[in-house]
């Protein structure tokens, strides 16, 4: 069996520098590594080895204790989203209160007046009030503007009357709602004097803070078991003429006079602020779950030996090109996702800093970019978990590998906070607007979309002889060809008599999706490339450049149609791309373990028997089956005898 330590000793990269890129700075990487090391010593934050044999109720209660232990470890700095990194990496499942701390608190800080912040923020942070983010309804999710819950202003009492007028209007799916929350940030249609002023947000108490019983007019509970998120109390909520004070509508950008005059200011997209902050979290913290999958799968691939070579020695499965093909492009994509996520995070912070000053100029670009990255990144994490599971054979199928839980716990992210197809369509809409802007006002195109300033130059690019220096130009060419063809297709449908909305909905969906997704792949490449420029260690820069090129070549090979259709490349170029792909697999294989271990993950957070740091998969797996699996400690003799008696007699 290949020793993991031998593989590590052969590595030539500087893991400290790489960890600094991953976590934003070497100091932050050191803090996360120390946090994860501290977790190894605290029993309360460990996930029990027999966790997946437990009932949902027992799992829920254990995670409640774990969540509070994590909060103690971060000194209750729950309003600092960076502090979530350690707990989310270490925990096997989603954490209690995570949704409301990541969404309700930011919403209050961005959408609330100072008086409202003073009234609620401290209680929320200290969890004296536990609030859920009650937006999604039984009948509507991504289509926020069609929500049916109503908040009708009563001028006589200076109150809002909250109602769910239909069964479809019932809030359904909000996390922390089913059991834990006693307050809800409710999104409802604002009705004043019979006029609908659109969806606004309201702080509504739903349970008594002492008895935890539902208040009058409230029907609330848990929606039941799910594919993943078993310890998350996703809930349902109905209102029957529930009255709340006028003060409870978050009112920094909208207000109502006592007489019922409605006044709005700022960008309408500001109402999506908390969703944007949650998408930032999905961009920066959750992708590190893919590092867990790859750490397990790569360690196992170095230690697992199958079939002999020509010298009669068993090969580590990582030596096989098919195994490299499964895992190394995922490793390259992981770095592209994480490093571009860091860049996006800074843009989000800049946007909301400017919003607080009354400057909304970055809002559209920020919202659109977050839509696309959220869709691309969350799909990647789930896809990565599945391929890592497959790469570990039968062991990958078992919970003791640590891989099934990653797939289950991150699958919901593909749908929550904006279903991924809808998210790509929102980005595509913005890209088409940029196409028009490029013709009239190219100076107004944001930096993150600057390739739209060079459309003619990009459209004229041809590549007869592939070199790695051409990867960026080829990605740019794919993006611009796809979006311009989509724009022309839309014009043709409109000129043929179809209205724009019908063309969008029924004729352009796949083209729009492909354009948006490809733009994000290009964006990831650019961010990855720019981040490598910060590396000072020469060999590390070489290895990361190889990893970057593998990412780029993989994208080009997976999606070459736009380049071939527009004669940007030839069949010979495609062959050169395939040859370079195989060459890059060979170059990256010796460094793959050290690259993924730059994420500083601790064994307890991996929750695996097959991918631990000391490389003893068989010892840990057998020990778990013999000593930890509670099913083996139950006497089933009576059950077996009863089954014998039930067998048909021939």
Protein language model regions, located:
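Flavin-dependent oxidoreductase catalytic core characteristic
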Residues: 1-650
């Amino acid at each position: 069996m290949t020793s993991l330590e031998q593989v590590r000793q052969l590595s030539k990269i500087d893991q400290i520098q790489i960890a600094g890129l991953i976590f934003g700075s070497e100091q932050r990487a050191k803090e996360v590594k120390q946090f994860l090391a501290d977790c190894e010593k605290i029993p309360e934050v460990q996930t029990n080895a027999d966790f997946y044999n437990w009932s949902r109720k027992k799992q829920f209660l254990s995670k409640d204790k774990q969540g509070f232990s994590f909060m103690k470890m971060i000194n209750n700095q729950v309003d600092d989203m960076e502090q979530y990194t350690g707990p989310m990496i270490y925990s096997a499942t989603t954490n209690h209160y995570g949704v409301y701390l990541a969404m309700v608190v930011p919403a209050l800080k961005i959408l609330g007046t100072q008086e409202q912040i003073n009234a609620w923020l401290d209680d929320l942070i200290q969890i004296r009030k536990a609030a859920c983010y009650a937006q999604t309804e039984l009948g509507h999710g991504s289509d926020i503007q069609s929500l049916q819950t109503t908040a009708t202003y009563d001028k006589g009492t200076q109150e809002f009357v909250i109602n769910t007028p239909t069964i479809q209007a019932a809030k359904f799916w909000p996390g922390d709602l089913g059991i834990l929350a006693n307050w809800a940030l409710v999104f409802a249609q604002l009705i004043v004097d019979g006029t609908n002023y659109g969806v606004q947000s309201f702080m509504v108490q739903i349970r008594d803070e002492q008895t935890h019983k539902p208040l009058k007019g409230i029907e609330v509970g848990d929606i039941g078991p799910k594919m993943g998120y078993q310890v998350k109390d996703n809930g349902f909520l109905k209102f029957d003429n529930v009255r709340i004070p006028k003060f409870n509508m978050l009112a920094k950008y909208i207000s109502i006079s006592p007489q019922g005059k409605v006044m709005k200011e700022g960008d309408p997209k500001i109402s999506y602020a908390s969703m944007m902050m949650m998408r930032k979290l999905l961009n920066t913290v959750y992708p590190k779950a893919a590092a867990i999958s790859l750490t397990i799968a790569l360690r196992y691939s170095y230690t697992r030996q199958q079939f002999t070579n020509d010298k009669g020695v068993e090969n580590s499965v990582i030596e096989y090109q098919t195994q490299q093909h499964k895992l190394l492009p995922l490793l390259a994509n992981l770095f592209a996702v994480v490093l571009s996520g860091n860049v996006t995070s800074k843009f989000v912070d800049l946007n909301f800093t400017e919003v607080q000053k009354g400057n909304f100029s970055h809002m559209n670009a920020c919202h659109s970019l977050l839509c696309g990255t959220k869709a691309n990144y969350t799909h990647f994490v789930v896809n990565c978990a599945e391929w890592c599971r497959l790469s570990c054979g039968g062991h990958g199928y078992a919970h003791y590998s640590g891989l099934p839980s990653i797939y289950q716990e991150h699958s919901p992210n593909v749908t929550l906070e904006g279903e991924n197809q809808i998210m790509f369509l929102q980005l595509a809409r913005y890209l088409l607007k940029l196409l028009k802007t490029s013709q009239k006002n190219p100076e107004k195109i944001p930096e993150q979309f600057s390739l739209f300033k060079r459309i003619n130059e990009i459209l004229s690019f041809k590549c007869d002889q592939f070199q790695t220096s051409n990867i960026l130009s080829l990605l740019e060419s794919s993006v611009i060809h796809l979006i311009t063809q989509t724009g022309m297709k839309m014009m043709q449908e409109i000129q043929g008599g179809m209205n724009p909305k019908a063309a969008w909905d029924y004729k352009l969906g796949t083209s729009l999706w492909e354009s948006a997704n490809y733009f994000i792949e290009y964006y990831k490449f650019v961010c990855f490339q720019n981040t490598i420029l910060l590396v000072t260690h020469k060999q590390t820069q070489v290895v990361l450049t190889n990893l970057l090129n593998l990412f780029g070549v993989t994208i080009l090979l997976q999606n070459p149609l736009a380049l071939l259709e527009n004669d940007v490349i030839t069949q010979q170029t495609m062959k050169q791309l395939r040859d370079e792909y195989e060459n890059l697999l060979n170059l990256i294989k010796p460094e793959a373990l050290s690259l993924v271990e730059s994420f500083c993950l601790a064994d307890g957070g991996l929750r695996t028997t097959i991918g631990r740091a000391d490389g003893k998969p068989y010892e840990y797996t057998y020990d778990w089956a013999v000593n930890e699996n509670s099913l083996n400690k139950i006497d089933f003799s009576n059950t077996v005898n009863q089954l014998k008696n039930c067998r048909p007699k021939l």
